[in-house]
Amino acid sequence: MGIFDGKVAIITGGGKAKSIGYGIAVAYAKEGANLVLTGRNEQKLLDAKEELERLYGIKVLPLAVDVTPSDESEDRVKEAVQKVIAEFGRIDVLINNAQASASGIPLSMQTKDHFDLGIYSGLYATFYYMRECYPYLKETQGSVINFASGAGLFGNVGQCSYAAAKEGIRGLSRVAATEWGKDNINVNVVCPLAMTAQLENFKLSYPEAYEKNLRGVPMGRFGDPELDIGRVCVQLGSPDFKYMSGETLTLEGGMGQRP
């Protein structure tokens, strides 16, 4: 018996890849959750569905949803959530992991398009999914897990739109934790650091910069998307952590220490 047998978790950015979203999907699948995976790359979503259903005997609903800047973004999320309800009839956990951004561009050189990409794909997407899922999370007394970043906590160079989106998500999450507490919905934030395909590419392209970043992690390694990030998300969505809400957890191997 798994913690989430018969329950449904939505994971944005959950397509098949060496990514945090897919690591979370595997962790939830191992606990019996049926999954809704959203993202922009339909093939990666279909690949994830095939593998997760084959390995874990769960049901996966892949939904190609693009929430980058567009007048249709809000309606796309509404449609996606209605498809979830039509398929499963419930939502128990919402995990807002997806985010695009124009990284590495100094604030003084950011265009409105650069900034909009970060805000729409991160902050607006999280807001839309939270608002549309709320009635169903209320029914199940569910959980929301939103993703922020050390880029926002510590003001990383070249990350202005990304950091702004992530800190907006933290503020949104605290308000939701306050407003939705009466419904027994808990809302928490995770700031992850994990070895993803994107980070592997960075290692190949900039080995010296990669090693410098690695030396900044007290534990001496980048996290595993499933074991170090996904398993924590499983606990945050479980009954054992129900009383914790409005908090930010830094899963960065000791690098994200704050007073």
From Swiss-Prot:
Keywords from the named record = Bile acid catabolism, Lipid degradation, Lipid metabolism, NADP, Oxidoreductase, Steroid metabolism
Q: Does the keyword rRNA-binding apply?
A: no
Q: Which InterPro entries match?
A: NAD(P)-bd_dom_sf
Temperature-related activity notes? Optimum temperature is 55 degrees Celsius for the oxidation of cholate. The thermostability of the enzyme is greatly increased in the presence of NADP.
Active-site residues from the entry: 162 (proton acceptor)
Q: Which GO terms describe its biological process?
A: bile acid catabolic process; lipid catabolic process
The UniProt record lists the EC number as 1.1.1.176
GO MF annotation: an example: cholate 12-alpha dehydrogenase (NADP+) activity
- PROSITE patterns given in the database record: ADH_SHORT
Cystine connections:
none
Query: What pH behaviour does activity show?
Result: Optimum pH is 8.5-9.5 for the oxidation of cholate.
* SUPFAM superfamilies, alphabetized: NAD(P)-binding Rossmann-fold domains
As its record notes, the protein acts as a catalyst of: cholate + NADP(+) = 3alpha,7alpha-dihydroxy-12-oxo-5beta-cholanate + NADPH + H(+); deoxycholate + NADP(+) = 12-dehydrodeoxycholate + NADPH + H(+)
Q: Which domain of life is it from?
A: Bacteria
Instruction: Determine if Lipid metabolism is one of this entry's keywords.
Output: yes
Q: Which family does it belong to?
A: Belongs to the short-chain dehydrogenases/reductases (SDR) family.
The note filed under miscellaneous reads: Enzyme reaction proceeds through an ordered bi-bi mechanism, where NADP(+) binds first to the free enzyme before cholate, and 12-oxochenodeoxycholate leaves first followed by NADPH.
Question: Self-association or partners: how does it assemble?
Answer: Homotetramer.
Instruction: Tell me the function of this protein.
Output: Catalyzes the oxidation of the 12alpha-hydroxy group of bile acids, like cholate and deoxycholate. Is also able to catalyze the reverse reaction in vitro. Is likely involved in an epimerization pathway of bile acids that converts hydroxy groups from alpha to beta positions via stable oxo-intermediates, which occurs in the human gut.
Q: What is this protein called?
A: 12alpha-hydroxysteroid dehydrogenase
Q: Which organism is it from?
A: Clostridium sp. (strain ATCC 29733 / VPI C48-50)
